[in-house]
């Protein structure tokens, strides 16, 4: 490379070449939801257009067809799935699963479901910055005992936000 530069540009050119040692190949990270076949996100740039209703109806329809279904209410700032599934009074709890404390999803209509709405009072405003909301969402995904699922439905918040970025960076949406 140095000879070519001097031949075609000028002999007076000073060439400094820095090389970098190749990084060792890193092991492929473990998938976050290894027992889930399909991950479907229901989203829209606008609020109030029926995302939560579509997500709930999709989950119920798939469950009625015999599929194993999980639903995550990822709308951290306006969770509505607990009400739609008549689970407003559900109290989340954890159990030891394979030596790790895991959150156990609520279950209704043969659908496993988690929502941030289970952890906050309905009339309480969520004043979380992006990182806090994203970390809460990651925990609802990775630290829950979802078991084997055919479909994992994500009810996303309106717009594009840190939540959406977290979802696409954390799990392979089908």
Give residue spans per PLM region.
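Conserved acidic residues
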Residues: 111-112, 150, 174
């Amino acid at each position: 490379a140095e000879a070519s530069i001097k031949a075609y540009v000028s002999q007076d050119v000073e060439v400094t070449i820095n090389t970098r040692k190749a990084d060792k190949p890193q092991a492929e990270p473990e998938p976050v939801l290894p027992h889930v076949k399909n991950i479907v996100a229901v989203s829209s740039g606008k609020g109030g257009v029926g995302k939560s209703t579509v997500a709930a109806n999709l989950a119920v329809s798939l469950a009625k067809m015999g599929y194993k279904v999980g639903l995550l209410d990822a709308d951290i700032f306006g969770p509505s799935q607990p009400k739609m599934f008549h689970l407003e009074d559900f109290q989340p709890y954890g159990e030891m699963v394979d030596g790790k404390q895991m959150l156990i999803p609520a279950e209704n209509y043969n659908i496993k479901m988690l929502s941030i709405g289970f952890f906050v009072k309905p009339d309480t405003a969520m004043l979380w910055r992006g990182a806090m909301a994203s970390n809460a969402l990651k925990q609802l995904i990775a630290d829950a005992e979802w078991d084997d699922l055919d479909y994992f439905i994500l009810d996303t918040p309106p717009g594009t936000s840190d939540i959406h970025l977290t979802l696409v960076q954390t799990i392979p949406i089908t």
